[in-house]
Amino acid sequence: MSEPEELHHPDIHTTAGKLADLRRRVQEATHAGSARAVEKQHAKGKLTARERIELLIDEGSFVELDEFAQHRSTDFGMENNRPYGDGVVTGYGMVDGRPVAVFSQDFTVFGGALGEVFGQKIMKVMDFALKTGCPVIGINDSGGARIQEGVSALGMYGEIFRRNTHASGVIPQISLVVGPCAGGAVYSPAITDFTVMVDQTSHMFITGPDVIKTVTGEDVGFEELGGARTHNAVSGVAHHMAGDEKDAIEYVKQLLSYLPSNNLSEPPVFPEEADLALTDEDRELDVIVPDSANQPYDMHAVIEHILDDAEFFETQALFAPNILTGFGRVEGHPVGIVANQPMQFAGCLDIDASEKAARFVRTCDAFNVPVITFVDVPGFLPGVDQEHTGIIRRGAKLIYAYAEATVPLITVITRKAFGGAYDVMGSKHLGADLNLAWPTAQIAVMGAQGAVNILHRRTIAAAESAGDGDATRARLIQEYEDTLLNPYTAAERGYIDAVIMPSDTRSHVVRGLRQLRTKRESLPPKKHGNIPL
């Protein structure tokens, strides 16, 4: 008998035959999708489930689980098509030498549709990740629930959501959406910590374009409704828009380098003692804030001066650009960054910015990553739409996030810190450990023009009647600025720990983080808080 025949029809009554039978089954499982389906996948610019795992996991480290799992459905002729793996590849391995668990949905098998066994495989690998304390990465490329299996498929979604919820804040959960993700399937990525999408090939929505047109009459395409750009720039559902799948996977690998394996571990550290001697680069910060309070500057430049190698790993870069969030390192230790961006809406806080920053602060707090906050905020964005859409309740999420955080918190006020926005942005009053201010800081209830209009309404009215309104207003504004628009009133009261030269910021941050590494703080015992959702 020829070798190929032995592979297809091994004598399973012998040891050699049993080994050959295993090899045959592994071969079938590895190529569960038809060649035509794989070809169509590649034609769309997409990788297969196993190709994605190969890119993500360190070479030779992947261990597959449930490779031979098969569905048990007998309806609609399903008993005649029972491929190994049931349309999802699950297992564990290493990313940059650190353990992770992973599941990768296979669109070449049943369109990646989730059935009972498919769901059980994902549940098992999630349970495995939670028990072993390692991150879980879900690669989503699925047509949704497997209709032939009915409520069994829906039940599996619910089981997965419950596991996502129980694992939240315990192990990092990252979702890669690299194809369709529709209906109930979208809620698993929504619960996870980070969601990465690929431009033009990823789509997430509860109801598709056809249903929307039937019900509401709205005519919308897949890309506009739930494409990567929509969820990165408009809805805020996603955290990064990748150019292709390789870029997406690279982003995930880099993201993992800032996160611990679980909430009981510390994030990965690459120790490198900082040279605290003043440099020309440090001195650049002394001239970064313009003389005019209304002139913007790029907060990215401030952040990059503080971080190792000026490397700022931004999250949700396209969403709520008036606030910046992301990771970096100081002396090799990961830190989270939250910063107002004067280049967008003058750095005002609005609903989107508040929720973006609140979620990021809570993620950092859950995974033991210190938070450094840079403040230049004139207040909350005024507008009827903001008020009616719930800025009070939704802005309060940022207060809640800072107030409940027990990780080291360092805040640097670079310029404006007005009104309630001053309190919200990591103030001493919410529990920040170290609050610094530049000499350019303006900490007050409001800006000079608005304050003078309220404080000196009668004086200004009388001056205007006498034809001296502009000069009087200018004099009163100058008096207000000299009296209150500075960091020293807050420093007198201990709300600011130190007023520092901008060029000394990195030095103060480095020393502060060194001291705060032994910080221990706990919250009052409770089942859980009631964040204003």
Stretches with model-predicted labels:
Residues M1-L533:
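Ligand-binding clefts of soluble mixed alpha/beta catalytic domains
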